[in-house]
């Protein structure tokens, strides 16, 4: 099994985890955005600490590294974790506020997923090369998400304040993918993920203390969705993303991660009693086709 294939499988698992967490997130919407994000991110970071300790005890490679290499990696973990954490806090909060300002859920999903377009566009500014087939996959994926989230809706496409929040959120998530792509090959992905969650959690909790008035009763009532999203969606999901992106092409990675919405629809059908329309099923098929097309080997790769 190649490293690229393993990375793609991990990204697919991440998309499944994030999609299934949609049901839990709906159950936790009674909490204000900074409160919800702060608690789930902090739990995600704390959940990774024992994982880091276990892997560190078993990892023999660290013993062979020089003191200078260890210091360099620690610095990279810290800088990368802080950078990713700040962007993650921004992106997740913008998304929550977009929904708070009553952006239609389907429209919000479509706008957010525009990060699959922003990744290659922003990547060009930092010297990233994108295979032509990826641009076609981005277009096919965008069409698929339209059918999945918006086709047949009476809401139209008028841009509201909430829509603007979600649009900026999509740009922030694209930046998050590119920043991870920059730092993850240079350090321990699990450690960097832990730092990013602790940073994002602290930032959101500070903003919560300034701008929100959280109810202890509401937090207690939502302990299960907070715990699920903190441990699985944040701790496991984002860590798999960080580790997988060591060997995955960032634009292809964003396409696989965009399957989150497909699995969110499936989870809604299985666990929340929701139903899928013909348009939604058609959108799922198109998106899967785009992702498969993006993973087909190039002529050079087939010859190797």
Question: For each predicted feature, which ranges?
Answer:
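C-terminal transmembrane-helix exit sites in multi-pass transporters
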Residues: 47, 51-52, 115-139, 262-282
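Glycine-/small-residue-enriched transmembrane alpha-helix faces in small-molecule transporters
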Residues: 1-38, 86, 90, 94, ...
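C-terminal-most transmembrane helix of multi-pass membrane proteins
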Residues: 41, 53, 57, 222-224, ...
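Specific transmembrane alpha-helical segments of multi-pass solute transporters/efflux pumps
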Residues: 21, 53-111, 147, 230-248
């Amino acid at each position: 099994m190649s490293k690229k294939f393993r990375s793609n499988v991990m990204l697919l698992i991440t998309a499944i985890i994030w999609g299934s967490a949609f049901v839990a997130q709906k159950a936790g919407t009674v909490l204000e955005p900074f409160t919800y994000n702060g608690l789930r991110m902090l739990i995600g970071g704390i959940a990774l600490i024992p994982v880091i300790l276990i892997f560190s005890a078993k990892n023999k490679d660290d013993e062979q590294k020089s003191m200078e290499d260890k210091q360099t990696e620690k610095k990279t973990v810290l800088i990368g974790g802080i950078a990713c954490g700040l962007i993650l806090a921004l992106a997740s909060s913008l998304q929550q506020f977009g929904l708070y300002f009553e952006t239609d859920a389907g429209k919000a999903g479509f706008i957010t997923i525009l990060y699959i377009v922003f990744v290659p566009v922003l990547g060009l500014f930092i010297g990233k090369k994108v295979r032509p087939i990826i641009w076609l996959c981005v277009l096919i994926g965008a069409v698929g998400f339209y059918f999945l989230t918006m086709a047949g809706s009476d809401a139209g496409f008028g841009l509201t304040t909430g829509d603007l929040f979600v649009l900026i959120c999509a740009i922030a998530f694209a930046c998050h993918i590119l920043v991870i792509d920059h730092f993850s090959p240079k350090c321990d992905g699990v450690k960097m993920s832990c730092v990013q969650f602790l940073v994002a959690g602290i930032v959101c909790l500070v903003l919560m203390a300034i701008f929100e008035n959280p109810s202890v009763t509401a937090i207690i009532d939502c302990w299960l969705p907070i715990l699920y999203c903190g441990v699985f969606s944040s701790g496991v999901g984002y860590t798999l993303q960080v580790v997988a992106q060591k060997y995955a092409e960032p634009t292809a990675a964003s396409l696989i991660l965009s399957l989150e919405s497909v699995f969110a629809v499936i989870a809604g059908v299985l666990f929340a009693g929701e139903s899928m329309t013909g348009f939604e099923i058609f959108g799922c098929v198109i998106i899967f086709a785009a992702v498969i097309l993006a993973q087909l080997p190039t002529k050079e790769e087939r010859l190797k």
